[in-house]
Amino acid sequence: MTKNHLFYKKIGIVFLLIASTLALYWQVSGFDFVGYDDSLYISLASKDLSLSSIAWAFSTLEFANWHPLTWLSLILDYNLFGSDPSGYHITNLIFHMTNTILLFLCLHAMTGSLYRSAFVAALFALHPLHVESVAWVSERKDVLSALFWILTMWAYVSYTRKPGILKYATVFALFAIGLTAKPMLVTLPFVLLLLDYWPLARIRNGYVVPANILPMEKKSIPFLLLEKVPLLALTLSSSIVTYIAQNKYHAVASLQHASIMHRVLNAFNSYVAYLGKTIWFQDLSAFYPYPKSIGIVGGGSSILLIFSMTLLIASLAKTAPYLATGWFWFLGTLVPVIGIIQVGSRAMADRYTYIPLIGIFIAISWGLNHVLERRPYRKPLAAFAAVFFLSVCSVAAYHQASTWTNTFTLFKNALDLNWSDYRAYNIIGVATEKNGDHERALYYFQMALKTNPQYDPAYVNAGNTLRKMGRIDNAIHCYRKALQINQ
């Protein structure tokens, strides 16, 4: 394939990626903010672009996180779009499209495989599990941090092919910037080690680098580990700041709330659930409540499945190194949010898969090619399978995105999937009260308290509504109940 021919093919793929992403997500330009952190994020970001705003972004620990770059991007949006949600949604979409294109180009630069890289990028663009990160304005940190994750990987590829201090400094700087968008990037040094194994083949593993890719100089494992020390220092610093922020806002659950065993079982159940939803993406929700109890049989089965798959993939590492990289990418990048250190009261979240699923997509794309490589009509079979699965993804993702139209559509969908979701009742109640329907709002607050009598925000919101209705004695009773719960 000539360079010109390859260039035009890449342009064509980029065009298809942009077109398909726009076809799926342009609907978000007409979406409202949702009553799930959006109003608070936008309210806090309603500042002029000034040195004091920049200082605030770098000093605040609001929402139990330190992510100044995310705050600055939202402040910029506020100065461009004011309170119009359309602009914020389009910004998220632009970041997602950019990430999709960069992921394709970065994977192609690493592997030399044009169509497999394109399939991974298309899965990244169109998978229903990624809807939450794109359609939810508050998840700006996902799409923004992923941009720097991919740029860091690409800079790392350049560094490994022609090492130098300036190139390493670029890797370091991009990683540092990415951590200011979302601390979940702390696992990136681990993923760079996986890339050293495959596809960069910097470790002796029997993997033959494609002829169109410049071969890497083989390095010892101690050297590769030492090479990551400056990046690991950034990981440690970010982890410490994140822990301080989450402790300050009491976001970390105590062992009384969830024992170590309970957390471990939930973590493995979540791994299995993420894998299941990757292939069979039904019952996607904005909130998955943390389970009060987990059966040993169910949790044990999840542990057995994950360990069995890990052993199987490790045994295939020589013949299918992409499986090892993809699988351990998935497992490793989910560690900060898998719940061993439990933050909040959710069991899992679709948004947590934005970067981790790239590993699974790599395994699927290269695995499909591997399975079909000796079969007749390999290329048309692979193309049909890829187009079919992407079509199913697109239809499901389009429907899932529509649930994010506004607060009511989002949380009525959550209640359709889990009628006892007390947070959903409370959030719908707040939105209903803002619309002036006090009686209906009160019903939702009562439903929240019926499903969780210890949920004090519902008492506070019910009290506020009763006060507006002139029922002062009832309002005082609700406020007292909220205070009793918080004592």
Question: Model regions: which residues?
Answer:
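Polytopic membrane enzymes that build or remodel cell-surface glycoconjugates and lipids
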Residues: 1-461, 468
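Short, intrinsically disordered, charge-balanced linker/junction segments flanking boundaries
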Residues: 470-487
